[in-house]
Amino acid sequence: MKIEELQGYLEKDGSRQRHFLFLYPLLFQEYIYTLAHDHGLNGSIFVEILDYDNKSSSVLVKHLITRMYQQNYLIYSADDSNQNRIVGHNNFFYSKMISEGFAVSMEIPFLLRLGSSLEEKEIPKSQNLRSIHSIFPFLEDKSSHLNYVSDILIPHPIHLEILVQILQCWTQDVSSLHLLRFFLHEYHNSNSFITPKKPVYVISISKENKRFFRFLYNSYVFECEFLLVFFHKQSSYLRSRSSGVFLERTHFYEKMGNFLVVCCNYFQKTQWFFKDPFLHYVRYQGKAILVSKGTHLLMRKWRSYLVHFWQYYFQFWSHPHRIHINQLSNYSFCFLGYLSNLLINLSVVRSQMLENSFVIDILTKKFDTRVSVIALIRSLSKAKFCTVSGHPISKSIWTNLSDLDIIHRFGWICRNLSHYHSGSSKKQSLYRIKYILRISCARTLARKHKSKVRAFLQRLGSGLLQEFFREEEEILSLIFPQALFRSHTGRIWYLDIICINDLRNLMIDHKIKPYNECK
């Protein structure tokens, strides 16, 4: 199925502006469920669902579509006691299939908009635009001139109707909105995915319907960031357009163009409130960083704005202390698995002119990133590779695998951790993590063969594990010429890492997935 064949569901009156029209009929197409189960559309932004049930065959999909044509299965009422409804916690598998198909159908317009936006701006389609490692070179370039940083945790208890209203601004397909409302209330009643908290309901992204709830969460974050970007765009003296190339920014500026005429006059008196040409905003998942060259008072104004915005727009009360304001030179913030801070180096230069001598103090600022060893040990502990204190233990559930497969799994994790944390200024911190994985691998092999670790290593030799735990520098030396490699022995940022994976979900059903790939 090609993308061009889907445009008929989205275009309106032959205009170039695409709307979310006629999405509901897509649920009756077999290829939608194929996209949800397989690799997405033409290798695009769709995420593969690794834990999808093997029962999702073409026969079941056809049976599901046949049942959906019988509209009585989709009718729901408060006193409905019919146990044969196609959607609900009593028929969880079909509910999961429909919710994933619904999420895919809602993602398709975003894909088409992204493609058209890149073509209009003549931006080549490249995976490098999606790399989260590209954030750190940006911070290295900008942070030396900034003063304050704010850690922001985006609030996520949100009322169900707010989610429906958010999507209502994007789509004119009433049937899809009714289906979305039905899904949310059905999951709430089953107490599986939405748990009640007065007066709102909390969405927890579950493994069973991860794609569906990830789409809803991204829609919510989209609205959270919209006015923030709008105010910054209006108040900035240097109007940068570079952020328009990012995936999450593409739709902001399309919506902003329609919103600008209405809001420009209304917010004209308050724009001076946020004037700051050196304000930078970076977000990954539910955590955001706001850095500024302005004063502490200006950062407090931004915090007040965000708190009131969440309160009046999303009906969510957030305590102001949820947003921390710190001086960048005296604070280390954790972001994307790195501990980052601003190092200040003092250099004394003595200058002499004729009979007079001068002593000049020179301050240089450098953005520094280090590995958060405690966080990595915590992740290894949750994945059952070590104890909470970092003592290696055997991976008992892998003892039924072959020796080569066990070593390959441990080596894969070790290499991917080294690959992701290659930007650390102190790579010696990773030695402890590699030691934990090596000893855990040896303990797992020894447990499988019912022998002691020392005796097992002496029998097979210490070189058994060396091939699978190569250092990142050794791999780079094989790729690049020796002269070029020596000049790049410092921090390295890779542009092929698009998300952070959890170690607990790194390998599912004996399938190994890279650490730098989405689940």
Curated annotation (Swiss-Prot):
Gene Ontology biological process: mRNA processing; RNA splicing; tRNA processing
InterPro entries attached to this UniProt entry: Domain_X, Maturase_MatK, Maturase_MatK_N
Keywords, in A-Z order: Chloroplast, mRNA processing, Plastid, RNA-binding, tRNA processing
Chief location: plastid
A cellular component term, taken from the record's GO annotations: chloroplast
Molecular function per GO: RNA binding
Subcellular location: Plastid, Chloroplast
Domain of life: Eukaryota
KW Plastid (keyword) present: yes
UniProt KW tRNA processing keyword: yes
Function: Usually encoded in the trnK tRNA gene intron. Probably assists in splicing its own and other chloroplast group II introns.
PANTHER family: MATURASE K
Similarity comment: Belongs to the intron maturase 2 family. MatK subfamily.
Name the record gives this protein: Maturase K
